[in-house]
């Protein structure tokens, strides 16, 4: 049987407040520790756009105002096996952005322990993995053009 990659959406989540773009990053606690954007699996038969809306709501407690799909995707292998992901060796991601209202975030405490609203320069330093840093650059370039 061929090794499988779990299909997910990466969601660079932002809000525009006082003419500045603020990015929402979450502090991961499940499976690994570090900072990331909301992300999550695409549940069959849901669409990628529906997965974006669901994951943003689940992980932040906020509804999306705008969603944009980007022509960027990739995959990565897990560094170790996870009991809840035993059928997969890694994840294949599709990049989206989602605008939400700036303000209070209601975290899913099983996955994340904290959050921050940051400007691009601060967010790019905090994000843990290179593929999410690249995703942030792509979205920021689009939003600031």
Regions found by a protein language model. Name each.
Residues 18-19, 102-106:
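Short helix-loop capping/hinge motifs at secondary-structure junctions, enriched
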Residues 13-15, 27, 95-99:
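Short, well-ordered beta-strand micro-motif
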Residues 20-63:
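Conserved Nudix-box catalytic region and its N-terminal flanking loop in Nudix hydrolases
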Residues 61-104:
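Active-site segment of metal-dependent pyrophosphate-handling enzymes
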Residues 1-23:
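Conserved N-terminal beta-strand and adjoining loop/helix that marks the start
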Residues 29-35, 104-145:
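Nudix hydrolase/Nudix homology domain
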């Amino acid at each position: 049987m061929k090794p499988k990659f779990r299909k997910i959406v990466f969601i660079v989540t932002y809000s525009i407040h006082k003419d500045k773009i603020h990015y929402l990053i979450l502090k991961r606690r499940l499976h690994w520790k570090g900072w990331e954007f909301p992300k999550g699996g695409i549940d069959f038969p849901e669409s990628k756009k529906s997965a974006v809306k669901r994951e943003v709501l689940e992980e932040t407690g906020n509804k999306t105002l705008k969603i944009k799909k980007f022509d960027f995707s990739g995959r990565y292998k897990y560094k170790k096996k996870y009991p809840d992901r035993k059928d997969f060796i890694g994840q294949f991601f599709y990049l989206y952005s989602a605008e939400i209202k700036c303000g209070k975030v209601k975290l899913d405490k099983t996955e994340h322990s904290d959050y921050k609203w940051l400007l691009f320069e601060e967010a790019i330093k905090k994000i843990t993995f290179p593929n999410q840093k690249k995703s942030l650059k792509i979205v920021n370039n689009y939003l600031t053009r």
